[in-house]
């Protein structure tokens, strides 16, 4: 049997050690003692909540789970502290009561009166540890583990005639009920703390998650060319926190990148503009040369240089996001058929479904001609053009587009060919993509392979697809569109 002995001393101090002995001189009053061990352990059952794979692991749920976990740990720790403190306090009160009763019984015995409180003389059931302290001539109390975990309270005092007067009581039912009620209240309070912490975490995490989603959406708009969008304005709020700092940093980065891009665009445009005059003069001078093969070479290279300068200027204008589309209503199939026939009569045009569209004919022609030129330069005949509703497809039967172009899209001065001589400058598809953006259209590229063939099988051709918008927008990304008055 394991128990706690307490022998009241003259000053009411607790004895050292785990035995919890408290002694007192005859006639002394034992004071309540805090922190004494009772020899009883409180068992706490903890539950583990499984999180399924289907639950979204966003910021709000992570914050909610963290707050709930911390709240559960704090509630558990406080519950244990309160439970043990309450139990120790009630046991101390029971000991003090037993000590007072044994003193009264001692005085009644010495006065020759009848005993009360269930006091016994020389009770053989007195715990051995308590008996050892009593034989030292001091009064003492003792707490032992009783059946079903209910403590037994003992008090004993040595008499002048050498006998031992003892008192044995059980922890009262009322005290046990109080402990049960306390434990129940602690459990309910802990559950309330966990649920309250979870709700608070969802609220806080939801606000943070919404701001982050707004920041991500604004950043995507900036990436798509929306120069007027600011992440800081998108997330809103008046409190400056880490999200606000992140938004300001993204805005600063976007501004710095935009300034650098704008500076590079201006330099490119200025250089191309300055080259336009001497190149025009060179082309004019070449026309004055006498006929012959050298003259043809000079004229061809001068014309190529002039085309390059014009293309560079066009790319610079498209990068400046200041281009406007002059809209007209046209029959797309008829328009494509006439333009392709004027460009190359050998190219087959198939109109699957005619459709009336509102677009800029000049820019659409530029996109179409650049796609045809790319197919003729890098692909193999036959070149096929099809029109189906608002969709234009240009296909060749060459080796297909380079993987870099399929992954990253057209890039200026990158042709995908190791030998750039006679293969253009990589500006044709770049201009086509830029003009498509001005039109509010979408330009995609893919390679044609046999059905079910793996990716390492050589392509049997390349297809460029231009998807014109169903409705003519007033503002497409960073390229506004202005309709022509009078059609």
From Swiss-Prot:
Q: Which reaction does it catalyse?
A: ATP + protein L-histidine = ADP + protein N-phospho-L-histidine
The protein's GO terms of the molecular function aspect are: ATP binding; phosphorelay sensor kinase activity
Q: Which InterPro entries is this protein grouped with?
A: 2C_sensor_his_kinase, Cell_env_sensor_kinase, HAMP_dom, HATPase_C_sf, His_kinase_dom, HisK_dim/P_dom, HisK_dim/P_sf
Name the principal localization, coarsely classed: membrane
Transmembrane domains' residue ranges:
63-83, 185-205
Q: How does it sit in the membrane?
A: Multi-pass membrane protein
Q: Which residues carry this modification: Phosphohistidine?
A: 273
Enzyme Commission code(s) on record:
2.7.13.3
Q: Name one GO cellular component term.
A: plasma membrane
Provide the alphabetized UniProt keywords.
ATP-binding, Cell membrane, Kinase, Membrane, Nucleotide-binding, Phosphoprotein, Transferase, Transmembrane, Transmembrane helix, Two-component regulatory system
Per the database record, which ranges form the Histidine kinase domain? 270-472
Q: Which residues form the signal peptide?
A: none
Q: What subcellular locations does the record give?
A: Cell membrane
Instruction: Using the UniProt annotation, give all residue ranges assigned to the region (Disordered).
Output: 1-41
Top-rank lineage group of the source organism? Bacteria
**Chain ranges of the HAMP domain:** 206-262
Q: Where is the composition biased (Low complexity)?
A: 1-11
* Key word Cytoplasm present: no
Q: What is this protein called?
A: Sensor protein CseC
- What is the organism field in this record? Streptomyces avermitilis (strain ATCC 31267 / DSM 46492 / JCM 5070 / NBRC 14893 / NCIMB 12804 / NRRL 8165 / MA-4680)
What gene name is given for the protein in this entry?
cseC
């Amino acid at each position: 049997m394991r128990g706690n002995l307490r022998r009241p001393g003259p000053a009411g101090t607790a004895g050292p050690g785990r035995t919890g002995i408290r002694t007192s001189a005859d006639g002394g009053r034992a004071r309540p003692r805090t922190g004494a061990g009772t020899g009883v352990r409180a068992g706490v059952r903890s539950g583990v909540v499984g999180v399924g794979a289907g639950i979204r692991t966003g910021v709000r749920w992570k914050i909610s789970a963290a707050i709930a976990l911390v709240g559960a740990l704090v509630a558990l720790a406080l519950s244990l502290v309160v439970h043990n403190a309450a139990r120790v306090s009630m046991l101390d009160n029971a000991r003090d009561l037993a000590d007072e009763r044994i003193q009264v019984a001692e005085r009644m015995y010495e006065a020759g009166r009848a005993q009360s409180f269930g006091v016994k003389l020389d009770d053989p059931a007195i715990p051995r540890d308590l008996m050892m302290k009593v034989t030292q001539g001091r009064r003492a109390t003792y707490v032992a583990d009783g059946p079903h975990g209910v403590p037994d309270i003992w008090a004993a005092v040595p008499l002048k005639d050498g006998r031992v007067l003892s008192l044995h009581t059980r922890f009262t039912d009322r005290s046990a009920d109080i402990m049960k009620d306390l434990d129940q209240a602690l459990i309910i309070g802990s559950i309330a703390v966990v649920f309250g912490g979870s709700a608070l975490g969802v609220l806080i995490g939801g606000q943070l998650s919404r701001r982050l989603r707004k920041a991500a959406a604004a950043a995507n708009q900036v990436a798509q060319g929306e120069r007027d969008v600011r992440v800081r304005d998108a997330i809103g709020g008046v409190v400056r926190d880490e999200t606000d700092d992140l938004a300001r940093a993204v805005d600063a980065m976007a501004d710095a990148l935009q300034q650098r891009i704008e500076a590079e665009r201006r330099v490119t445009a200025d250089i191309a503009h300055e080259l336009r005059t001497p190149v025009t003069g060179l082309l004019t001078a070449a026309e004055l040369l006498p006929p012959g093969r050298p003259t043809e070479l000079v004229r061809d290279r001068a014309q190529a240089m002039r085309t390059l300068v014009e293309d560079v200027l066009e790319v610079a204008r498209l990068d400046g996001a200041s281009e406007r589309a002059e809209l007209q209503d046209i029959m797309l199939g008829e328009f494509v058929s006439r333009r392709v026939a004027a460009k190359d009569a050998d190219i087959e045009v198939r109109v699957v479904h005619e459709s009336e569209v509102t677009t800029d004919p000049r820019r659409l022609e530029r996109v179409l001609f650049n796609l045809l030129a790319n197919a003729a330069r890098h692909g193999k005949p036959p070149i096929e053009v099809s029109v189906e509703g608002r969709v234009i497809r240009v296909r060749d039967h060459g080796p297909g587009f380079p993987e870099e172009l399929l992954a990253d899209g057209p890039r200026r001065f990158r042709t995908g060919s190791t030998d750039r001589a006679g293969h253009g400058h990589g500006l044709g598809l770049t201009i086509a993509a830029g003009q498509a953006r001005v039109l509010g259209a979408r330009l995609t590229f893919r390679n044609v392979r046999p059905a079910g063939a793996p990716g390492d099988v050589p392509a049997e051709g390349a297809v460029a697809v231009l998807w014109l918008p169903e409705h003519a927008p007033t503002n497409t990304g960073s390229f506004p569109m202005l309709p022509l008055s009078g059609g």
